[in-house]
Each structure stands twice: as structure tokens, then as C-alpha cells.
Amino acid sequence: MTKKRAVKERLILRNPTEDCIAPKVQKFEMQILQPEHIKTYLDAAEKRGLLPMFYLELVSGLRKGELTALLWSDLDITNRTISVSKQYVKNPNGELTLSRPKTETSVRKVSIPQEAVDLLVAEHKKHPNNPYMFPSPVTGEMYYPDSIVNLHKKILKDAGLPHIRFHDLRHTFATLALQNGMDVKTVSSMLGHYDAGSTLRTYTHATRQKQDEAAQTMGSFMAQVM
């Protein structure tokens, strides 16, 4: 029973939540790793022995908890896919635990390019008996999500690139995929979004560019036939 209904039915005198001030939602401006910076970024990642992990991130847009939770068995070499069925998250006590993604659409298979498969196979040869896709060289266990955020910051610093959040690598994947012709529904399914509408709302800037290009194409066509 809601507090408002309890007041209406005179079970309580007043709604104790009415005077509560909701905390402000912290909003972050979406940024992407600019295309001209991608090679510099990946070169810096390679020097740290982290190229497979961050290359995969840029071609898949996985959430950090999904990326760190990957097992070697999640890679389908033949079909060039990654199975996303778990994530590393903090529970209410602040402890890191493995759990299923929060929505069914987040449980998915993500297609990746052959270059990513080759990098992952080469990475696995370095630790063939370890079940984790990206084990920490220190502990042999999977990385904490916050650990790869810190690694990302170090890569940016090494490369002399401006700061962007690790989550912006996910935005980079989605934006570049849309700008290079991937349809919204496919991008949405790869990101694990609930529906294509949420993808459209998030990446309006990318789809608007494609609309502008389509308009110019139609304009050129009409100029030829008139």
C-alpha cells in the first residue's frame, strides 16, 4: 500500500515522504573517443599488454561489468560471437558479485570482427589454463570493474589524450556503428538495450547525421531526374 493511499484511508495522518528532497541526479555529458584518436589509444593499450581487452570494448560496447565477467568459454570462435550472460556488480552491501544482467535483453550474443577473435585467441595462449578471458596478471582472477576504469585512465594519460569515461567507449562503439551504416535495431541488440527506442533517444546525434546524409543523397538523385 502506498503512503498516499494510507493517508486517504486515514491509516496514517500524513505522508512522511512529502518533505523529503530527492537527491539531484548527476548527469554526465556523453563523449566519444574521436576516430582520429582510436589508433593512438589502442597503441597505448598494446604497450600495457591490454590491446585485446580494449579493442574488444571498442568493437562491442560491453558494459564494464560484462567485460570483466567474460570467460574464455564465452567466445565462439567459429561464429565470431561473445556470449554475454553475467556481469560483475556491487550488491547492496557494496560487495562485488557475479549476477545475471538486469534485463533479459542484456543476455545476448554479440558479433565481433575476426580481428577481435584473433586477438582473444592470442591472449588466451598466454594463460591457457585460466578460465577468465582477461585475468589479472597479478592475481590470476578476473579484474574488478573499477580496475579496468583505472587502466583506461592510464591508457589515456600514456597516449596524451583528453579524458573520457570508460563508459564513453561504449558510446564510441554505438555512435561509430550508427554513423557507418549499422541499423538502429542491430546496435540496440548488441548494446543489450530494452528496445530500439532507447537507443534512438540516446544516440540522436548519430542518427541525425545519417538522416542528413540520406537527405543529401535524395537531393542529388532528384536533381538528376528533374
Residues covered by each model-derived region:
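C-terminal secondary-structure termini that scaffold catalytic or DNA-interacting sites
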Residues: N79, P92-D118, A122, V138, ...
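Catalytic-site neighborhood detector that most strongly recognizes the C-terminal catalytic loop/helix
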Residues: K24, I32, Y88-K90, G140, ...
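C-terminal catalytic core of tyrosine-transesterase DNA break-rejoin enzymes
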Residues: K8, L51, Y55, V59-E66, ...
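DNA/chromatin major-groove-contacting recognition/catalytic segments
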Residues: E36, T40-E46, N93-R100, R201, ...
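Active-site/catalytic core of tyrosine-dependent DNA strand-transfer enzymes
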Residues: E36, N79, Q87, P113-P162
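Basic, Lys/Arg- and aromatic-enriched nucleic-acid-binding interface segment
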Residues: K8, I12-N15, D19-W72, I77-T78, ...
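Non-catalytic DNA-binding core/recognition domains of DNA-processing enzymes
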Residues: M1-R5, I112
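Proline-centered turn/helix-capping motifs that create local helix->coil transitions or kinks
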Residues: A6-P16, D76-K86, K90-N93, A122-N130, ...
